[in-house]
Amino acid sequence: MTNLLSRAICLVCLIGSLIAPAFAQDYPQKTVRLISPIPAGGAPDLIARAVGHRLAQIWPQPVVIENKIGSNGQLAADYVTHVAPDGYTLLVGMDSLFVINPYLYKQSAVDVNKDLIPIATLGTNQFVLSINANLPVKNLPEFVDYAKKSKPALAYASGGNGSQHHLTMELLKSRAGIDLMHVPYKGGTAATTATIGGDTVAMFSGTSNAALIKAGKLRAIAVSGVNRSKVLPDVPTVAEFYPGFDNTIWIGLFAPRGTPDAIVQRLRRDVARVLASPELIEAFANAGGIEPFSTTPDEMQRLIKRDQAKYNKLISELKLKID
């Protein structure tokens, strides 16, 4: 009887192993929804539309983008955790949802390690350290020296407490050993206006401010990634002066926990194919200098854990907490 039961279990496992790849080959058989946590025009939305358009050409099945806005992205993430884990509703989410919000907000609805499956990263973008055009410095070392000599401390702008612009500047302050006064604004546009007008003297922003920099309204003195930005190739990285400095934003694709691995792997392969296409690379470049960033689920999981450790430490040191 025991031998017969063992054979039956092996047979079930064998059938399952044969069905899973076939199931993935047939996927998708209907419309796939990509859920974006921010309004149309933001980086996750632009990435979702560019990737979704090209996935629809590969499959071919329709891919629709739905914007579910609210609670700093938690509304969209929570929604995806409660849908059927069948690969037909996916989240296109920014890293801050999972590596900053859990430590910044007293209540965070989604635990990426329990509620979602990372499929692949899609794109990345750098932050640009820009200063008021009238500030008497031309580069990062001069800015650091100027900041050290300034009394009272120079004021810098951000798009809000706990924003990645804010946290990136705090990382730079720590590495450079400078004191700057943080002035949070309601969004990046207001922070940019303040820096151009001289209410503040510096800020980290996205590469979307490249037009203002090229017009001379802001002066870019560094970018936050390991490599120079293709949008601003003449601007050095912070790491050229402070080795190892690396702080960028990334956007990823997530499925509800319980989604079959065969579908996750099918999505990963198709996404990697899309991200390698010249048309996608051009579309990303035209969307504010976003660069394709392709990883496997395991690589993405390691990236999440690395960034969680980094931001948890920083937010704890700053004693930041938002209700």
Protein language model annotation of sequence segments:
Residues M94-D95, A133, G206-S208, G225, ...:
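Short secondary-structure boundary segments
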Residues F23-K114, A153-A155, N161, G177-T207, ...:
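N-terminal (or domain-start) structured segment
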Residues H82-Y88, Y103-A190, V238, P243, ...:
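Hinge/capping helix and adjacent helix->loop/strand transition within the periplasmic-binding protein
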Residues Q29-T31, R175, K214, D261-D323:
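An extracytoplasmic/periplasmic, membrane-proximal ligand-sensing/linker region
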Residues M1-L5:
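N-terminal secretory signal peptides that target proteins for export/translocation
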Residues A190-F245:
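Anionic-ligand binding region
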Residues A8-A20:
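Bacterial N-terminal signal peptides
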